Amino acid sequence: MRYLLPAILLLGTQIASAQSILKDKDDKELSVLLNEVVITGTGTEHYLKDAPVQTEVITSKALEQYQARSIDDLLSGLSPSLTFHDGDMGSHIQLNGLNNDYILIMINGKRMNGDVGGQNDLNQLNPANIERIEIVKGAASSLYGSDAIAGVINIITKRNREKMELTNTSRIGEYGDIRQSTSFGFNYGKIKSVTGINFRHTDGWRNTDLQWDQNQLKSGSTMLTVNRSSNYTLSENIEWQVNRKLDLTAEGTYYERWVMRTHGPWKYQANDFYYRNYTFTVGSKYKLGKRNYLAADLSYGRYGYFYDYKLNEHTDYFLDNDRHERITYFAGQRIKQSIQKQILGQVKSVFYLGEDHILNAGIEYQYNHLESPHHIDGDRASVYTLAAYIQEEWTARENLVLTAGVRGTQHKETGLNFSPKISGLYKPGEHINLRASYALGYKAPTIKELYYNYTGVIGGGALTAYHGNTDLKAQTSQYASIGIEYVGQKFQASLTGYMNYLHNMIELVEIFVTPDEKFLEVEKSKQYKNLTKARIYGMDFTFNYRPAKSLSLAGGYSYADPKAQYPNKGIDYMKYLPIDATSSHNANLNILWQHSWKLYRLGIGIYGRYQSTRRYINDNNADGFQTWRINTAHSLSLIHISEPTRPLYISY
């Protein structure tokens, strides 16, 4: 058991009022699991066991017991299909062989905007504030548009249901790992408000003193595997029920992050990283009666990325004057690298037509503007996307539901595209569900893939130049899946097989280093290019077994074989090679025991995860590994100060 890594974590302190007692929660958990309402697969509400599109749900019970240190830790620990590796640019996510670019991440059904280097920064989210997570795998472009070729992750946050509620979660771990989150919510008449602050810090760590420099592996490096960093998020969410038909919402966030990089042998790290983001969102929902409704949302986000200089640096950029002097940055300066602005508007309607039909239609507009001195020709660029979609759910028979939809998208650079999808749910028996789907996916190149150029070092590797490409085409895919699910009182399991064929897949491809780059000591050069083809074959298996009220077992296995044709491989350009940084085998196993006494509940969990070798085209493969974690959770019921009949819970 070379990679066995047990860890006993006494995590978090939560103080919150609740309306149910501990024993009632135990008795109801099973029925809640079977009747969980999900929305992500079709955009309309369904019980999990009746959802026309296969949906994986991480429940509030699993989240509470796991006590994750981060969203990355939570998702990789509880879903076998997802893998992560932390980086300064954000959360490097993979789902069934495809990376972050092909995964749409949503918060309460709304697109999570803003990224740096193509990576969403999940550090902004507080794990303690999540109610549940819904994961839909496979192309969902007909409903959600670009970024949804691999699937959708919808993070549903908790809503304030009390007149007044204060929640605090604190976590301290090795390597200076500190997580602190506090939220305060109240209800006043028809208005609900939740104010939150989330803080995270790590001193960083490293697993080797070896570093790649000038085509040699040298020892004595001071570079960290994970850099020292701190970040915090301030958030405010307001809901106003104007009347029985109209609901209004408003939300704002402010986020700052500092990443401190070490300076020492082999690399001259003249600067640290600094990020500053803020977002604003307003929304409305108007109920038309009989479950029909109209909804509209408008959001604006501004995402800043800066260098904080700690040493002087003489750059290769020139001042705009007649003397052609080089630009010099001095210690203490904060220099803008990029400012990304995004506007997203959406109008959606859902109509229940009789007992057998649900019509879902909407329009969306998205505008992206990127400003980056010295990295973009003319220092700035922008793209827009305009889309319309329609989807019909038809209950053809009591045990047969068919769903069909299509989306039309107009993109500034790649033009018009149509993305249809059809799926079906058939119930041959009381406990058996059969599902099948076929979809065409669509993914427009990002603004950074089109226009952005930069040079940097990632993970202690070679100094590499990265180049955008304005000749990129839109990526398309053909996705098909078939699955079977068993839903019983004590045992639930699902098995799904899928194929995903991608055309014009965009990847960073190694190109020749130019003489100018060699002069700047650049060791590698890469450019975004459309690959000829890519294909992924895979299967997912998940299960949940509850032999007794106090004991549950859950787990899963995910197999993926992602391969692509690389245009720069000479005579082998037609050969399918593994897609960079992918692993074929991923599995997890969770065992949870819980017992409740009159005022106290104890939970003990064992969590294991296995990941096979991660493969690379031009670099060495990363070894497979397994991790094991032992976790205890304790809940104590006290007397509520203001209302003695209501219990107060302390969990740790």
What are these regions (language model features)?
Residues I639-Y652:
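Single conserved hydrophobic/aromatic residue that forms the stacking wall/gate
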Residues R397-N399, M499-Y501, V522-R614:
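Gram-negative outer-membrane beta-barrel transporters
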Residues G304, K412-N417, Y426, H431-A480, ...:
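Surface-exposed extracellular loop regions of Gram-negative outer-membrane beta-barrel proteins
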Residues D72-K110, E131:
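Extracytoplasmic beta-strand/coil segments of soluble accessory domains associated
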Residues N227, G332-K348, A381, A387-Y389, ...:
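Outer membrane beta-barrel strand-and-loop segments of large Gram-negative receptors
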Residues L33-A62, H92:
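N-terminal periplasmic "start-of-domain" segments of outer-membrane beta-barrel proteins
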Residues K110-K137:
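Short acidic/polar hinge/loop motifs at secondary-structure boundaries
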Residues E162-K163, R171, F186-F273:
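Periplasmic-side early beta-strands and strand-to-turn transitions of outer-membrane beta-barrels
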